[in-house]
């Protein structure tokens, strides 16, 4: 019976713990995705085959 108050206190503390999903989004988080997309488009346009021009028009 001595563990019941400790268990209740722990249950009350769990919702107040900070979550990783609550962290604010910064501008630095967007940069890698944008540069990744640009790099992918550059690679696709570079590897375009001359016999099939439709493969060049991606995006």
Curated annotation (Swiss-Prot):
Residues making up the signal peptide according to the UniProt record: 1-22
InterPro entries the UniProt entry points to: T-conotoxin (IPR031565)
Any Pfam family the entry gives: Chi-conotoxin
Compartment annotation: Secreted
Gene Ontology CC annotations of this record: extracellular region
PTM annotation: Contains 2 disulfide bonds that can be either 'C1-C3, C2-C4' or 'C1-C4, C2-C3', since these disulfide connectivities have been observed for conotoxins with cysteine framework V (for examples, see AC P0DQQ7 and AC P81755).
Modified residues (Valine amide): 58
Main location: secreted
GO MF, any single term: toxin activity
Residue ranges listed under propeptide: 23-46
Domain of life: Eukaryota
Keywords, ordered alphabetically: Amidation, Disulfide bond, Pyrrolidone carboxylic acid, Secreted, Signal, Toxin
Residues found modified as Pyrrolidone carboxylic acid: 47
Similarity comment: Belongs to the conotoxin T superfamily.
Free-text note regarding domains: The cysteine framework is V (CC-CC).
Protein name (Swiss-Prot/TrEMBL): Conotoxin ViVB
